[in-house]
Amino acid sequence: MKNRDRILVKIDKLREKRDILCQQRFLYTIPFQEDIYAIAYTRSSKKSNLNLLENSVLYKKYSVITIKRLITQLRQQNFLKIFFRDCYRNQLDNPKNHPYNKLLLEGLILILEVFSPIQIQLGRNEWKSLQSIHSLFLFMENKFLHSNFILDIKIPQSLHPEILIRIFRRRIQDTPFLHLSRSILHEYQDPITSDTSISPFSREQNSLLILLWNYYVYEFEYLVVSSWKRFSRLQSIFSLDRIDRTHFDRKIKHVIRPYWIISSKISSFTKNPCIHYVRYKNHSVLAFQGTNYLAKKWRNYLLNFWQYHFHCWVQPHRIFLKRFSRNSFSFLGYILGIRTRINKVQAKMEDELPITCLITKELCPIIPFLLLVNSLARGGFCTNLGRPVSKLSWTTLTDDDILKKFDQIWRSVYYYYSGSINNHGLFRLRYIFRFSCAKTLACKHKSTTRIVWKRFSLNSFLRSFLKKPELVNSSVSKYYLHKRRFWYLDIIQINPLTISLRERYN
């Protein structure tokens, strides 16, 4: 206990003294400390259930002697042969489930969690992280309207472990620690992916994959920021030269003086280009204003970007160029586009009342109804044509549980798609859920849907959820009721129905 408290105090001091830590780049000595594995084991025991922990292989084989034996083998010159000797002795034993390997994984995760934020702090990018899903759409409504091109980017999900080692080499200058990390990562034959739901790895391995994936995405965003800054400065110089040249061509007949005298007075006319970036997991969107030639240049630049910085080839269809004013794109289960809105404005003057048209742009989030119907059909709620069917797997539940499950699903769907402009899609989804619930109860009780309507009063079922939330201020409530669109900033996870949509677009 004293050793663990001592190492925790030591780690806190290292986090406080970031400048000293930047100079001490030698991390290879940390895996040889016994306290690291004690802290990792204590942390894993708090996250896991005690009943499951007692039956686990790590709990049975974890001891101080095991840690000392592991550290002794790490000090060997050819430690890999000794480290996996027991695993290779039995062909049926999987080296990924070896207790030594799990201990090393926990220790490596702890080291990277402590030191990676400090290294990232040194080159912090300028992107702002938002926890709410709907806050991304609010940002896009404010910023994307002035952009005419977007780059729909699908970041590669699968990574080779050697790519991550090369990323570490830019931040960590400790060669032995890199060799140790390479030895651990190369033990997993499967590529590293960001989707842990389909990953065959254990909890410890998934924690390492998430940590490495976040580090990889940070490097990508950091390099994009630096590249855009360089491009912004070059674009400003180019705009300045073009303004000066136009001014020089107009005044050359009347003013006789050197060109460099004029160029120093027109810097206020230049305007830096602006880029807007949004990302959720591996799906990111770049929006900017420029010409078609500039947009193609940016697409070609990003295609070569991964090959140069991350040593991997990206398929061209993963970076799709679209003109935002004409095309729409899919993001987080919505179909997003821009539409023009014409408002007639009447100005009051002394003699007449002229009517002018004010043209504005607004973001149009649309529900992909047909794709959602396909997702509901795979879930057993309806057919591919949208006809409701009974959920046969739920007929063994009680009536209250069936009503509660349909209630929860409808609430999540309604609140997630409350910001769409086509409310008729929500009404059609409500129709599917209502009749699917009625047919499920009718199938359970072996009756007709008409009897179920009368018994459970399903005519009023789910009707209350279509009402807008009441606001505290009545005047504000009257103002917002006619807009019929709401963004809920407490939604922090994507709706399960949209996961299949993301897989289709990926």
Curated annotation (Swiss-Prot):
It comes from Angiopteris evecta. Belongs to the intron maturase 2 family. MatK subfamily. Pfam families: Intron_maturas2, MatK_N. This is Maturase K. GO terms for molecular function: RNA binding. One of its GO terms (biological process) is RNA splicing. GO terms for cellular component: chloroplast. The keyword ATP-binding does not apply. Usually encoded in the trnK tRNA gene intron. Probably assists in splicing its own and other chloroplast group II introns. It is found in: Plastid, Chloroplast. Keywords: Chloroplast, mRNA processing, Plastid, RNA-binding, tRNA processing. It comes from the Eukaryota. HAMAP family: MatK. The keyword Nucleotidyltransferase does not apply. Disulfide bonds: none annotated. InterPro entries: Domain_X, Maturase_MatK, Maturase_MatK_N.
